[in-house]
């Protein structure tokens, strides 16, 4: 395939030119309102400079051309003095030309669009995974673009957009499109030619032969056009006519070969000799094709090889076909073979047409690619005034028709509401068809089935279990702190000032505060648990009933209105359930049965017709509104300058009369249908059987509503309890973590206090021992003065108060930080990292040597704590 070269263009300053035009024609303020549109249009012009050989580049060029065409129709560039510079180069010679004409710009943009389409078609033709139809459509679109250029732009400053050149491009694109169109047919037909041993061999369609002849004819036309252009204008690629000539010869020869095979499939044997003549003719044409000069250039090597192989393969196929056909003719047909020169050419059939430019995209794709008209608001001032008046006329028309439709809908809704339709009609029809009273139906409403599918029984006991565990743990922590406080107090009472450890009450206040907070939380949580349990107990029977699932027969029994009413009824009551409906209408009065059987279908039919009538009316009005809103007569007004505005408006509004007439028809039809429906429904409601069924159905519905409301409340309570249970368990998990941290801190605190007490006791004992040794030394080696002798029968003097140590093993406990459990520190944080102290046995809390026992009755009990 032959792709066309792309042009190059330089930047154009659209922004300044358009802004100046609008400012001079409409005023500077109005020009400022188009700043965004002008900027978008300028970007479009810049984008086409880099448009590629793909669908994106195609869309960019088409979008710019459409917006440029719209702008040109809304301004008079010649009168306004707007003269932007458009610089484009020739696609082959690269000659640059600059002009101010918008037509020059449009012609070059269209050439670029056609060239990109040719490149897309050529690329898709080489892609085996691509549908040949895509390439076919691309070439047809390209042909349409070049046809548009030839029709609209007569004078071209550049050769590649001249009349003769673009018409030649049009023929080339059509030829390539038809070549892609008949590729599949050619492949199937040629495959049949090789099957010479079967009876059905040679059954090839004459249509394929004509299509190939059409391809050859189109390439011949393109060849002649390119040859004439090169001779007259000295312009063009020299390879174009060579390729076109080669394909012309090849497809003409292939058409002759396929046509020859189609003649062999004729019922008359007289055609067999003619078919051999066409085969010989195709061989001559293939020989001519093989001797043609081929294109030059490195980029044509692949084409030349492909062309030689194609012609050689076809020539071999033609020769083998000729050999087998002559053999069959000599043995069987004995038909006279005419000379190839006397045979006429195969009738060409052209199936391709240039796609009009406006049909290149489907409507939805056109809207997507082009987008909104950037300059739709840019119209002449007098047209703006006229369109404003016309818009008021359209609005008045819409309001009038809208009011008519609203009144018609209100009448329909009022009539149906008064008769209770369609609900009463469908319910009555169901009652009569079921053969039993609707009040005894045990169907469970869907909403209750939804409750039953979701509800499960709840177990609230984990709340109490969690609460008890936390309470036990917090009591253990409290007891541990209390025991330490008791021990410290006893040591202080015995050693007095010698026991330098700080009182427990001064350092355990924060821990005790944390314990109280946990206890208070447990009390509050317990109250909430009791409320939750009470709420659940109130709906527990209904919850247990729902939890048994949607197939629970007790649910159906509960909704059985007759079963429920019979339990509370004191005596027998006659209802329609006592009647025999098992035999359908036969159990009723024959006359009444016949009447209902006729009236019910009539009512149903009338109701459906009313529904369809209303839908049709809404659809018509929607279409009518859309038509009115999209109606733009600015072009008509521009072309009708000086005419009577009222006459123009009247003529333009006449196009909406068909919609008005259709709306009127639906309103009239609705009135007749309502009357028929009301008459039939009145007769139905007077029937005694119908009256009884309506009464029983109402009773059943009332009963069902009561039960549904009960289950609704139970379901809502269940959801609240379930949510409360989940939140309660989560609360207890958090509280358990808090209790664990308090317990760890209490244990570390007590261990630290006892270790501190051990150090203090050791210091006291050491000082006492040193003092005794000093006194003994003075007794043995002193001067013997009476002041140094101990008092007869007295106890030794108490040692002095030990000095406060600054190391880690003495003084105030350094391992407990009260701020960690202060009021501003949440429980959820990690407990403070205290210095780890081993837990000594109970009798080793304060060292190996126990302190002197206190006097009194508790002597033995006190000693037991240090052993």
Swiss-Prot record:
Report domain BRO1 positions: 1-412
Query: At the top level of its lineage, which domain of life is listed?
Result: Eukaryota
Which spans does this entry mark as compositional bias, Low complexity? 782-796, 830-848
Pfam families this protein is in? ALIX_LYPXL_bnd (PF13949), BRO1 (PF03097)
Comp. bias (Polar residues):
803-817
Segment Disordered: which positions? 778-867
Q: Which PROSITE patterns match?
A: BRO1
Subcellular location, record wording: Cytoplasm; Endosome
Name the GO terms of the biological process aspect.
protein transport to vacuole involved in ubiquitin-dependent protein catabolic process via the multivesicular body sorting pathway
Gene3D superfamilies assigned: alix/aip1 in complex with the ypdl late domain, alix/aip1 like domains
What InterPro entries would the database entry show?
A: ALIX_V_dom, BRO1_dom, BRO1_sf
Which GO terms of the cellular component aspect does the record hold? endosome
Please explain the role this protein plays, according to its UniProt record: Involved in concentration and sorting of cargo proteins of the multivesicular body (MVB) for incorporation into intralumenal vesicles.
The text of the family note is: Belongs to the BRO1 family.
Protein's name in the database:
Vacuolar protein-sorting protein BRO1
